[in-house]
Amino acid sequence: MELAYITIRFESPEEQKFVEENISNLTVYEHETWPEDSGYMSWTEFDISGCEPHDVQEPLDEVMEMWENRE
């Protein structure tokens, strides 16, 4: 089976942590977290091997909406 990954860049380490903890069907393959004042953007690679596009996009949309609507 061929490996496949998607890389997502985040505006803050808090956003990155929230997404990693709340996306249930994707596995974190690798990530890098930078301090907010460093000027770098944090990123996470998710393993999407064997996933159909909707298996990736729909959960990502849901968790990003949760992030935007948090209190």
Model-found features: residue ranges?
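A general secondary-structure signal for short beta-strands and their flanking turns/coil
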Residues: M1-Y5, M41-W43
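Acidic, low-complexity, intrinsically disordered interaction modules
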Residues: Q16, E20-M64
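Short, surface-exposed ligand-recognition loops at beta-strand->loop->(often short) alpha-helix junctions
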Residues: I6-E15
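Short intrinsically disordered terminal tails
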Residues: M1-L3, E65-E71
